[in-house]
Amino acid sequence: MLILCVLPSTMSRSAWVAAAISCAWVAYMHRDKRKWSILWRRYKKRYVLWGAGIFLILSLAAAGMFFLKPDSALGRRFMWKMTCRAIAAHPWGCPTGFACAYGEAQSLYFASGNYASWEERVAGSPEYAFNEYLEVALTYGVAMCILVLFVIFGCLWIGVKLRRYGICGALISLLVFSFSSYPLHLPAFIVTAICLLLACGIGDVIGKYLVLCVCLVLWFGGYAEKWTQERDACRDWVNARILYRSGAYEAANRAYEKLYPSLRKKGAFLFEYGHSLHKSGRYDESFEYLDQARLYSNDPMILNIMGKNCQALHEYKCAEAFFLISVSRLPGRIYPYYLLAKLYSEPDYRDKDKFGDMKWNVLNRKPKVYSTAIEEMRREVEEIAENWDTGSSIICSDDVESEE
């Protein structure tokens, strides 16, 4: 009852659905078949009417959950669509991980121009697919996903045969929740899933003690030390981030350099390191770390800073390519259009027609979140346009980088 009191306050529709389905399944499995058979024959019409009423209520509840947070629901639908496209491109798995494959699929989709306006509005740069099954299929391959599902349903079958309905219900709840969230990216849920699989019956088949011994060997064989090192590195990262955000980039660079061996697979860390190097004027080094960050994050800001590095090195074609990829990654963002407008106003790369197109996008596109940064970008683009015919352009020491 305590859990039922807390559940509504979470505003998690996935959790509500998972709890409802698992509870209904457990209640159904504990039914008295003989009594239900007698009642069905006696009150068949009444049960049919009740069933129709329950179906109507559930339909209204589903519609209500959608309209509770419509953009969130549409956003997940779009993420699943992009993940499926990425799976089609990488049916045997993507060795570079989810973020890289997802970002590539989304860029190609928006670059085609064949998409709905709501898709542009809800698109983002997610770290997870919000569907564990699709993410496993993309990261490790469709065959591995099928194998994992086979093992899970095998455990459920054993659990049902052993009449462990409560444990099976808990596992079903986790499976339903995994359909529209990312529980298996959190250690607590991973441990819970392993314990539930063992309790369902697979532990009786292969031996609980054997499984526990294997887990302990893996833990003490490296994972414990690795997680401890990463935890300590993340603590030091917080201190380095203070330097980064306060503008002490040289000091931040030294701190990031020490942390790099432990955090070299974290996209957010690599972006901060690369951006800090960019701010320090070390454009080649910045490009190197941002190129690594692309493998672990699909944030278009990585592409924007890579393009700015190229522009600072007077490699304008390369800069244009990165800015255009950023536009196709999230066409609703104004910042890459602003960067392209500034690029096309460079004395060695001036293009009035392309500048005009980018100016229109900067001035007329509606941002997701309005801010003073939007005003600054629009004002600067208008100033560049006013000074275009005189042959001069507005040169700023730094671009606006906080937007939307």
Can you name each region flagged by the protein language model?
Residues 85, 96-138:
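Interfacial juxtamembrane loops and adjacent helix segments
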Residues 245, 279, 312-313, 346-347:
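Register position in tetratricopeptide repeats
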Residues 252, 286, 319, 354-355:
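Single-residue signature of alpha-solenoid repeat helices
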Residues 18-26, 57, 167-215:
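Transmembrane alpha-helices of multi-pass inner-membrane enzymes
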Residues 237-238, 268-272, 301-305, 335-339, ...:
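Alpha-solenoid helical repeat scaffolds
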Residues 4-15, 19, 23-88, 214-229:
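A membrane-periplasm/extracellular boundary helix in multi-pass inner-membrane enzymes
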Residues 140-168:
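Hydrophobic transmembrane alpha-helices and their immediate junctions
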